[in-house]
């Protein structure tokens, strides 16, 4: 087989605005790139997804399936055209890749290259190792290549046996964009299967261990994903089965240790109702469920605590840390992956409702707040920052000098401090803490988080790349409870319409769902559903909130539109009918509205 020079490209880390919020996109959604749109990235069903196209030209699409499945199609048969689509698990660079005792991946795919301009393509496991706080360890982009067309590496390597198959392993140096932001020279690690295939099991952790045996530096694991990539080519990859897991099938899962992503987070909603506990040597659980990150943590000074996950981002935390230097936290929200500066996000909103109280104290305190970090990846002169937007507190008022500002119609005192301690980078260092403290306490409401970032920037405070936005319950030498019954984090303001991806309207599926319709009903506002929210299942639901978009209810711990959804006039003007069931199954959404299927033809969902 001929040897062709192969160009490995990393997707430049720019998050498409419409793809964040509420945990990302949903099954059945088709994301497209081309004509100036180069990337979509987010989380759906508990699995990360990304589609990326170089700005050299071409086009492509990625349709999300249930779980981690997806279908990718690309046409990048142009000079230096490069496309990729991948799904998997984000591990958040919490610990070294070889510290995970087991990571497995099962997949089935149909993959073929349909065109080429002296190019190539491949189907592979893909990810990164970050060198957070690890001296002498390189930044690494890794590939476990299972199938390919028109490419065989000519690099010197070594043959190893993993999962009963022969793989050639080698490494290269590459200069280009990275997940840290900017461009730099980094390592690429490869395992290339000598017998191609498009389905099977991969013990990913065995590849990491084999690379380590060769003396290759192993950093903190950022992600494990199945990737379809094309260079100056066109093709299709239909991944009909994909599972990534950290507990070997047939074995009993061990308790989660510090920094471990629980295997239960891999399946989207499988951890709903699960109670995580800390104490007696167990000090942390961390992962993703229902598209939202979660963490419970307890200092090793003593005490205990628990966190019970609800649907969406909701949770209940209870803690007993009324001991000397006892410290507890529990939080849920969205991970933004330090992809770009916090102030580069036009809008980030957070809605919440909680019952919060401190039940005991050993000269301690507690607080309910929005919490996160700014990382200083590739940003000279910008500090590492831990930030707090404090909404309610007990037995704590900072005496720091600050400035009063008005955000969301309320007064906040803003100030910063220096602090030395453990960080998300690993190890201990001195970093900045930014604070916004609400002067009128509350336990529910709306927070325009992005306005706090912008206000801090106005003061000349350094703003780094946004790592996360989470609602946090924290106790210091205290005991208490926080029951968060409503929590939503989103990047499209309510009342605006997020971008949609075009898709062909072709289907042979039919479905019927019946639901009685009250004689007297209100119409659910199209301005609400245009933001991705559903209409409440009860057309006569209780109205919690009213604004220019319509009337808002709450269902399954998330916002919904009160009333029956309207059938779009843009659909009926094309000659299609409104579906006879006003609560029909939505097969497709575009600028015209929501489309259902009835009698083997398209119809408009609503009434």
Swiss-Prot record:
One Pfam family hit:
CBM_10
GO MF terms, alphabetically ordered: endo-1,4-beta-xylanase activity
Which of UniProt's keywords are assigned here? Carbohydrate metabolism, Glycosidase, Hydrolase, Multifunctional enzyme, Polysaccharide degradation, Repeat, Signal, Xylan degradation
Statement: the UniProt record of this protein carries the keyword Hydrolase:
yes
Q: Which residues form the GH11 domain?
A: 35-242, 280-487
Catalytic center residues: 141 (nucleophile), 223 (proton donor), 386 (nucleophile), 474 (proton donor)
Q: Where is the CBM10 domain?
A: 523-563, 566-606
- According to its UniProt record, this protein's enzyme class is hydrolase
UniProt keyword annotation of Transcription regulation present: no
Write down the InterPro entries for this protein, in alphabetical order: CBM10/Dockerin_dom (IPR002883), ConA-like_dom_sf (IPR013320), Dockerin_dom_fun_sf (IPR009034), GH11/12 (IPR013319), GH11_AS_1 (IPR018208), GH11_AS_2 (IPR033119), GH11_dom (IPR033123), Glyco_hydro_11 (IPR001137)
What does the record give as its pathway?
Answer: Glycan degradation; xylan degradation
Q: Which GO terms describe its biological process?
A: xylan catabolic process
Q: Which residue windows does the record flag with biased composition (Polar residues)?
A: 248-272
Region annotation (Disordered) maps to 248-284, 493-514
Biased-composition ranges, Low complexity, are: 496-514
Cleavable signal peptide = 1-18
Q: What is its EC number?
A: 3.2.1.8
Catalysed reaction per UniProt? Endohydrolysis of (1->4)-beta-D-xylosidic linkages in xylans
Q: Which family does it belong to?
A: Belongs to the glycosyl hydrolase 11 (cellulase G) family.
Query: What does this protein's UniProt record list under function?
Result: Hydrolyzes xylans into xylobiose and xylose.
Q: What is this protein called?
A: Bifunctional endo-1,4-beta-xylanase A
The organism encoding this protein is Neocallimastix patriciarum
Q: Name the gene.
A: XYNA
């Amino acid at each position: 087989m001929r040897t062709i020079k192969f160009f490995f490209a990393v997707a430049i880390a720019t998050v498409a605005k419409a793809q964040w919020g509420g945990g990302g996109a949903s099954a059945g959604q088709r994301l497209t790139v081309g004509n100036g749109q180069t990337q979509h990235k987010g989380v759906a069903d508990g699995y990360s997804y990304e589609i990326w196209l170089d700005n050299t030209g071409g086009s492509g699409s990625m349709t999300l399936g249930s779980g981690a499945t997806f279908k990718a199609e690309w046409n990048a048969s142009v000079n230096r055209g490069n496309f990729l689509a991948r799904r998997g698990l984000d591990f958040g660079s919490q610990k070294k890749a070889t510290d995970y005792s087991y990571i497995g991946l099962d997949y089935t795919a149909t993959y073929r290259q349909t065109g080429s301009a002296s190019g190539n393509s491949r189907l592979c496991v893909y990810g990164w190792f970050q060198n957070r706080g690890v001296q002498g360890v390189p930044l690494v982009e890794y590939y476990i290549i299972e199938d390919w067309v028109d490419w065989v590496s000519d690099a010197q390597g070594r043959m190893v046996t993993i999962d009963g198959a022969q793989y050639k392993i080698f490494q290269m140096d590459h200069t280009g964009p990275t997940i840290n932001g900017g461009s730099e020279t980094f390592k690429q690690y490869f395992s290339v299967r000598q017998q191609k295939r498009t389905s099977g099991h991969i013990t990913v952790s065995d590849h990491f261990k084999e690379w380590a045996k060769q003396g290759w530096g192993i950093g903190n694991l950022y992600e494990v994903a199945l990737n379809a990539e094309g260079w100056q080519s066109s093709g299709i990859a239909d991944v009909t089965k994909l599972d990534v897991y950290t507990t070997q099938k047939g074995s009993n899962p061990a308790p989660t240790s510090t920094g471990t992503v629980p295997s239960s987070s891999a399946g989207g909603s499988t951890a709903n109702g699960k109670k995580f506990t800390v104490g007696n040597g167990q000090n942390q659980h961390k992962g993703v469920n229902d598209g939202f990150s979660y963490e419970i943590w307890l200092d090793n000074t003593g005490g205990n605590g628990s966190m019970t996950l609800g649907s969406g981002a909701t949770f209940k935390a209870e803690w007993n840390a009324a001991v000397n230097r006892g410290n507890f936290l529990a939080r849920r929200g969205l991970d933004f992956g330090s992809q770009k500066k916090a102030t580069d996000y036009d809008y980030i909103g957070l809605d919440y409702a909680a019952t919060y109280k401190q039940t005991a104290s050993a000269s301690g305190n507690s607080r309910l707040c929005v919490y996160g970090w700014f990382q200083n990846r590739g940003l000279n002169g910008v500090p590492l920052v831990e930030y707090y937007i404090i909404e309610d507190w007990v037995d704590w008022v900072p005496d720091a000098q600050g400035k009063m500002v008005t955000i969301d119609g309320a007064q906040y005192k803003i100030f910063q401090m220096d602090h030395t301690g453990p960080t998300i980078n690993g190890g201990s260092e001195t970093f900045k803490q930014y604070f916004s403290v609400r002067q009128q306490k509350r336990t529910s409401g709306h927070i325009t988080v992005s306005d706090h970032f912008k206000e801090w920037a106005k003061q000349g405070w350094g703003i780094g790349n946004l790592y996360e936005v989470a609602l946090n319950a924290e106790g210091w030498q205290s005991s208490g409870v926080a029951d968060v019954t409503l929590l939503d984090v989103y990047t499209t303001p309510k009342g605006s319409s997020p971008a949609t991806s075009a898709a062909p309207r072709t289907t042979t599926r039919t479905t019927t769902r019946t639901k009685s319709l009250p004689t007297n009903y209100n119409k659910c506002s199209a301005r609400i559903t245009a933001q991705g929210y559903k209409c409440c299942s009860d057309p006569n639901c209780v109205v919690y909130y009213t604004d220019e978009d319509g009337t808002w209810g709450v269902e399954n711990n998330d916002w919904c539109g009160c009333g029956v959804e309207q059938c779009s006039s843009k659909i009926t003007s094309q000659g299609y009918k409104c579906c006879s069931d006003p609560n029909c199954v939505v097969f497709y959404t575009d600028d015209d509205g929501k489309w259902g299927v009835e009698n083997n033809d398209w119809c408009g969902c609503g009434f």
